[in-house]
Amino acid sequence: MQTFLPSANATISASMLDSKRLNKQILECYQILNVLSGKSKGGGWRNHPAVLMWKGYEKGLWKYVQAMIVEARSRGIRTENNEANLNNLKDLCWDIWGDNPPSFWNDKTKLMRVVTTHKASLFDKDPMFYARFGYAKHSIYNSPCCSKCKYYWVTHEGRNA
């Protein structure tokens, strides 16, 4: 589970993703919002870093997924089923969703670590498509939070590498 942020801007992030990952982002955003809204059956994923990084900022995740949908539609990717699920969840939960920025958003170093580790991971997933992100592999900001992770998860701060 992951919400890829190769840019601090959701619209730019959406435009940078390959179609496979772009479409997957829409589903994963629904799953994350579902967990954060307490609507998910069972307790799975509630402690996953991709869920925790958006806790309290569900409206920001909503904006992110809307950017993914707009980009997907522009590529001819069908999103109707996921959109229906998202809209139903929004209708039920909008008033309880938080609008605070994630903890990393206003910290330049943390934001650069998030963006850079996401670019490096995308490069690893598809080096041909993400060749323009190859530089991220050697960036000083490509420093995952711990030795077990590929990403910088703000939620893991304080763990030993």
Language-model features, listed with the residues they occupy:
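Expand to "…catalyze enediolate/carbanion chemistry for C-C bond making/breaking, isomerization
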Residues: M1-A161
